[in-house]
């Protein structure tokens, strides 16, 4: 089954969101580096790399399914926070938002009756559960 236009558009929006997330985490890494918090900066860099991996997974799957995948311009990300805890609060809220986006993408796959895409997206659903848990666990330490 070839990707429908609706699925192609939804995947392209998610790719854009994943790339924005990578930029957000890179910005957070810079913030922590400037504060001398190397461990936090390292964690954020790893998160940024992971977001790019997510974008690439979406691109590869979309291309395989005949979708016209593209890289869209992304908006600027924040660069300052009041304190380190505020950064991790932002991380948690952002990961909850990404979970909603993935759920919406799954809804499109269900509406388009594309079972292969639903199966593919289950990995992302499970990944978001882990991402929210990790962010909450860090916040709980503050």
For every predicted segment, state its role.
Residues 1-142:
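Iron-associated oxidoreductase/ferritin-like identity signal
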